């Protein structure tokens, strides 16, 4: 392969993730973009999705037309987590936690600016990454016969010119489907077109599945060719969308330009948007010229711990997959715990527990029998100190939680073994996994040791069904989260603001929100308080909230400088960072407001709407959530 330029770095083996992130944000800032902070890894006030899973997710209201306080050009690096990818981790490119570099045009620029800018960022030696354009391949939308959507010929012409300016002839090849690509291969192409399954974006999927009113559009992806030999088990021929590992997607520009009509036709949006997402870790790997994401610098310290404790080297055939799973899972766990998530049996806590338990099993495979996860996780604090200092600040908590969970899971393994013994020759590996968290691989090994024939195909079928249901649930949650601005949910969101202030009035000013979950059926708030509330305190909180509902107070949104909002004492989300200009919602005018919070909305226009139909605010339950944290569930009825 042609050597590629490395970024300035004290390490000899490639660019640091911090360099790639910094250059990206500076590049787009120079082009008029406001750099906004990453949203929290757990979405605020959104019960329909467990995690922030893309850079676009926190910005959906603005892509749908709501004005953003920072303007029409935005850029960021967003912390993201995809639980559905847990089982995929182990190859050279899949991770659960990752950072998504993003830039957005909210009705501002479009294809003619976006594609040249990203190409320049990738290839420029002055402002960008200095990637060799010979290693870049792109895909575009081939059109969709079912919906009548035309092919994206405009992007094809833009890409031809960009490569041509670098002295590269960019042959266009129409593949249409991944299967066709597996049959025909590259054919000397540089630009490839695929159908709606690969190169169209909408929340509902392909054009035919989009409901009336839904927006969407074609996208154009960029792949980096690492020059690895093609693995024929992924198809006869290789092409950009092949999964053999030779090509890795490093960026995707989505052009939101259409809205579906009642008659199933599409019309151009009056304001077209650009939504770009680029994998930070994958871009860093491309700069290094090494397809293995787990060799980038943020994993160095953790990888060294595993090598020392196991006596094995990363790259050893029998160790690499276990290394990768532990490295990925402990990075995610570090961000989870430092964001306030604790191991548990539901929602985010369950996912964290699953990550930890899988890591313990993989450590066992490496021959590490003593506690090691806390030591592995320790290196991530320093690795992300520049962008996410809260991880390093929570080092002691991360260590304590991982050590505690590791001890607990060792006990779980003991319980699982007892149940396995009771089963005799009729071992139910799926039940052991779902009930006790007992790893299927461990059950399989013990069955082999005892000469028991375990029908692993049936087990894997059940596991695959279980995994698909989880993925479908995650997809439904994500889709629902984008659209759930239902009237009653909005009312509960406003009631949540009233409740938090009422708690501060009754329990003291040190009470602050530590989590929330709002649906159209009820609201839930986690808040800092060290003891159980008395019945009298709960009644007083209810009285205050209902009093503010009866007072028919206007709810006002104001965009202002962050410093001004802080001076006003506006409540803000625990652990979150905010841009220089923020939106605040106040119950009442700012100079005499009952409550003021940093918030993106939506809310009712007046508190009286919460009492429509004679409804009153009522606390259903007050209970402990975790140490020093209480939880209230409440309704309007």
Region spans (language model):
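A glycine- and charged-residue-rich anion-binding loop/surface
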Residues: 1-637
């Amino acid at each position: 392969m042609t050597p590629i330029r490395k970024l300035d770095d004290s390490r000899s083996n490639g660019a640091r993730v911090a360099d790639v992130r910094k250059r990206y944000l500076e590049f787009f800032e120079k082009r008029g973009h406001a750099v906004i902070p990453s949203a929290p890894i757990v979405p605020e006030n959104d019960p329909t999705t467990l995690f922030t899973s893309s850079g676009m997710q926190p910005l959906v209201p603005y892509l749908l037309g709501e004005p953003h306080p920072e303007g029409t050009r935005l850029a960021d690096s967003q912390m993201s987590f995809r639980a559905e990818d847990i089982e995929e981790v182990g190859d050279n490119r899949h991770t659960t936690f990752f950072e998504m570099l993003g830039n957005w045009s909210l009705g501002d620029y479009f294809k003619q600016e976006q594609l040249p800018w990203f190409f320049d960022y990738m290839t420029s030696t002055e402002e960008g990454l200095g990637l060799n354009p010979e290693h870049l391949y792109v895909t575009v939308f081939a059109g969709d016969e079912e919906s009548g959507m035309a092919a994206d010929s405009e992007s094809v012409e833009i890409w031809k010119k960009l490569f041509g300016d670098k002295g590269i002839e960019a042959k266009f090849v129409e593949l249409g489907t991944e299967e066709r690509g597996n049959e025909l291969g590259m054919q000397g192409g540089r630009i490839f077109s695929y159908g709606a399954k690969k190169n169209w974006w909408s929340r509902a999927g392909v054009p035919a599945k989009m409901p009336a009113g839904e927006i969407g559009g074609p996208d154009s992806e960029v792949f980096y060719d690492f020059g690895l030999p093609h693995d024929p088990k992924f198809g006869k021929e290789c092409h950009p969308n092949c999964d053999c590992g030779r090509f890795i997607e490093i960026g995707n520009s989505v052009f939101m330009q259409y809205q579906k009509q009642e008659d199933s036709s599409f019309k151009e949006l009056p304001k077209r948007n650009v939504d770009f997402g680029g994998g930070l870790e994958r871009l860093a790997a491309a700069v290094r010229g090494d397809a293995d994401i787990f060799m980038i610098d943020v994993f160095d310290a953790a990888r060294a711990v595993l090598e020392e404790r196991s006596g094995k080297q990363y790259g050893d055939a029998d160790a690499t997959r276990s290394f990768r799973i532990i490295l990925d899972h402990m990075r995610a766990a570090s961000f989870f715990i430092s964001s306030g998530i604790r191991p548990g049996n539901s929602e985010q806590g369950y996912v964290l527990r699953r990550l930890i338990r899988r890591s313990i099993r993989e450590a066992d495979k490496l021959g590490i029998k003593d506690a090691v996860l806390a030591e592995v996780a320790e290196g991530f604090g320093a690795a992300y100190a520049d962008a996410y200092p809260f991880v390093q600040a929570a080092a002691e908590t991360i260590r304590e939680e991982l050590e505690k969970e590791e001890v607990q899971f060792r006990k779980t393994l003991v319980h699982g073994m007892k149940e396995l013994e009771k089963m005799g020759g009729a071992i139910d590996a799926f039940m052991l996994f779902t009930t006790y968290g007992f790893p299927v691989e461990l059950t399989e090994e013990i069955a082999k040791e005892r000469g028991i024939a375990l029908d692993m195909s049936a087990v894997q079928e059940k596991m695959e069904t279980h995994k698909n249901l989880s993925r479908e649930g995650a997809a439904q949650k994500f889709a629902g989260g984008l659209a759930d601005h239902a009237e009653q949910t909005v009312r509960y969101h406003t009631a949540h603001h009233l409740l938090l202030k009422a708690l501060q009035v009754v329990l003291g000013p040190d009470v602050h929100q530590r989590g929330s979950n709002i649906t159209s059926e009820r609201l839930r708030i986690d808040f800092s308080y060290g003891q159980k509330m008395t019945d009298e305190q709960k009644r007083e909180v209810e009285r205050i909230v209902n009093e503010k509902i009866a007072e028919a107070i206007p709810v006002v949104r104001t965009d202002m400088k962050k410093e001004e909002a802080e001076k006003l004492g506006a409540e803000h989300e625990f652990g979150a960072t905010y841009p220089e200009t923020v939106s605040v919602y106040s119950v009442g005018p700012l100079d005499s407001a009952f409550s003021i919070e940093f918030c993106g909305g939506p809310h009712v226009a007046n508190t009286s709407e919460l009492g429509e139909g004679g409804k009153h605010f009522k606390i259903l339950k007050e209970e402990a959530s975790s140490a020093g944290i209480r939880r209230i569930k409440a309704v309007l009825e």
